[in-house]
């Protein structure tokens, strides 16, 4: 799953390099969270609740989740973590990790219903374009992959 986070970061950097650099005084404060593995009632659930409060109190402008929001990708976990994320008072965006796609009991359909996209998201924040997509493995504990259709999507969005 670490490869998908790296790809997300490089994708965002690549996309932003195609546009003029903002003036030196322009800033965008991003909170980036990944692999939070929230399960209702576990320690990650409690820690994430604290993190949401800290982010709300911070000066960050946007929150990005890089995948593995849940531990098992169950419908109950996805509903729970979405409820917690919805407490954020900042704009936020999330892409699924392998725990939401490969390990999921719904094969990512619950993620798509709750989060509003099938694993690809493009958005602007300030002068920046962010492109996020799921690059997780298609079986448990395998290496991530960038699919041909993902590259075509990146090119079309950028």
Label the model's feature ranges.
Residues 1-2:
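N-terminal secretory signal peptides that target proteins for export/translocation
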Residues 5, 20, 34, 39, ...:
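Generic hydrophobic/packing signal
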Residues 5-16:
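Bacterial N-terminal signal peptides
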Residues 75-158:
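Extended active-site neighborhood of metal-dependent phosphoesterases/phosphodiesterases
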Residues 18-80:
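N-terminal active-site segment of His-dependent metallophosphoesterases
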Residues 6, 29-31, 139:
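Preference for short coil/turn "hinge" residues that link or interrupt alpha-helices
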